UniProtKB/Swiss-Prot annotation:
A cellular component term, taken from the record's GO annotations: cytosol
CDD domains: GTP_cyclohydro2 (cd00641)
Full protein name: GTP cyclohydrolase-2
Keywords for this protein: GTP-binding, Hydrolase, Metal-binding, Nucleotide-binding, Riboflavin biosynthesis, Zinc
Residues binding Zn(2+), per UniProt: 54, 65, 67
Gene: ribA
Alphabetized SUPFAM superfamilies for the sequence: RibA-like
Pathway given in the UniProt record: Cofactor biosynthesis; riboflavin biosynthesis; 5-amino-6-(D-ribitylamino)uracil from GTP: step 1/4
Similarity-based family: Belongs to the GTP cyclohydrolase II family.
Annotated GO MF terms: GTP binding; GTP cyclohydrolase II activity; zinc ion binding
Binding site for GTP: 49-53, 70, 92-94, 114, 149, 154
Organism this protein belongs to: Proteus mirabilis (strain HI4320)
Lineage: Bacteria, Pseudomonadati, Pseudomonadota, Gammaproteobacteria, Enterobacterales
Length: 199
């Protein structure tokens, strides 16, 4: 177990009232949160989203990615379901950090795609550690999920970590002219299950 559960409080949102649960990485002190909606106890699989932190998309309304659109859509779907969990995985920029993400954006402005930009900066295409999310699920008492994702890597890692993903629920929102190439690159080079534009 890499995390410990630290604190919780009610979080009213436009989608209804969630319980915000805070976790801390034991080794680093870095924090992560889960937003819990409704009663997640029992044996029925829980609708869930693993959402990696994206300051630019989640808070600054960037159109370069689909993150903000996915965050809003996931919270809305969980609310409509009546129960569910969003894990807010604080690994900004696929875990290269905000400043390196800005550097990667600058390289993309020069014509590199999102994967090429990460590699040019000396990183892997995706540096995230999703095993932390399995720890969050376990600390919340969740063992079976219906996962809102387009990323097969998340499903694979959750299953390897003992979380049973019984269904993948697609979350395809927010495509626009500013992020179309980015989304196509995620589909082509990272295996994300997205509908591409007509060729």
């Amino acid at each position: 177990m890499k995390l410990r559960r630290i604190a919780e409080a009610k979080l009213p949102t436009p989608f209804g009232e969630f319980l915000m649960v805070g976790f801390e990485e034991i080794a680093t002190g870095k924090d992560h949160v889960a937003l819990v909606f409704g009663d997640i106890s029992g044996t029925k699989p829980v609708l869930s989203r693993i959402h990696s932190e994206c300051l630019t998309g989640d808070a600054l309304f960037s159109l370069r990615c689909d993150c903000g659109f996915q965050l809003e859509a996931a919270l809305s779907q969980i609310s409509k379901e009546g129960r569910g969990v969003l894990l807010y995985h604080r690994q900004e920029g696929r875990n290269i950090g905000l400043l390196n993400k800005i550097r990667a954006y600058a390289l993309q402005d020069q014509g590199l795609d999102t994967v090429e930009a990460n590699l040019k900066l000396g990183f892997k295409a995706d540096e995230r550690d999703f095993t932390l999310c399995a720890d969050m699920y376990n600390l919340l008492g969740i063992h079976e999920v219906r996962l809102l994702t387009n990323n097969p890597k998340k499903i694979e890692i959750m299953k390897e970590a003992g979380i049973n993903v019984v269904e993948r629920v697609p979350l395809i929102v927010g495509r626009n002219p500013s992020n179309a190439h980015y989304l196509d690159t995620k589909a082509d080079k990272m295996g994300h299950m997205l509908f591409k534009k007509a060729q």
